[in-house]
Amino acid sequence: MNDVPFHSSSASDARGAVSSGAAPEPAQSFEETAFRLYACEFSWDIEKSLQLALFRTYAVPEISRILATTGEFETRPRKRYDDTELILAETIEHGLDSARGQRSIARMNAMHARFRIRDDDMLYVLSTFVCEPVRWLDRFGRRPMTESERQAWFRFYRGLGKRMGIRDLPEELAELKRRNDAYERKRFRSAETNNRIATATRDLFLSFYLPRWLNWAGRPVINALLDTALLDSMGFAAPPGWVRHSVLAGLRLRARALRWLPQRRKPRRLTHLPRPTYPEGYRIEELGTFAKEKPILAIRTNGDPVAPSEEMDTLLALGTQVD
């Protein structure tokens, strides 16, 4: 039995009646505000900005080498992308300290524990999830985030960072942005693994819209959304000026049109979208990568190991991997 059948109700259905008003009520928690932004107000924009955030992490050779080690981005890019998106979506749709949120964070931490990852690298990846949606909405959203929304978005991901064990987390959004910029100036540089992972991801995103034989036409469109430092670090060609101008103008035109349309009121949950990777749903404990592709062991509260195929809702979040 699958952990999450698609189109089923979730444990967080209480979030289904989220207001789509521009500013949160004073009593709302930062998690509720972050969920509203993600699922109702800026659903498409945040999803696209987080896709672009992935590219920024590929411009760092130390990060791209780790991603290349698993081979997943090149051999099974759709699964690797879906797993990343679903793990993050579980935390924001259900809450950081919900049962599903805790299991998702534990799954993510187990994947990271297999590698020696520097704290500043982890913090940078986390910072892209905060900074890129804010920047995208400033440029292409029907409106930018309000200051209180920016702070709620920051606090949500800061809370995620704490649960990931990242040390020296910035206390303020401005400091996170400063460190994000400083990291990119220092660490962006070209590498063969940057190009490999970025190319596989770009082709994956194009496959959402185009047949493979038309990828050549779509690549300049994605490149038009990337800055020069990013293009150079990944070995991508700069798009023709007219392509960049057309893409950016189209996004700004979309933003103006959206201001005249009613806002989404029913949450769009990424965990409920049909995915060819998981046609019958998925289990949190089966998401992501594993050492030597062997299954993970979960642990009962009494300490006995069980196989992942058994019902896991009453288990502790995660146990140890089998080597």
Model-assigned labels for residue ranges:
Residues M1-D323:
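Mature, function-bearing regions of proteins
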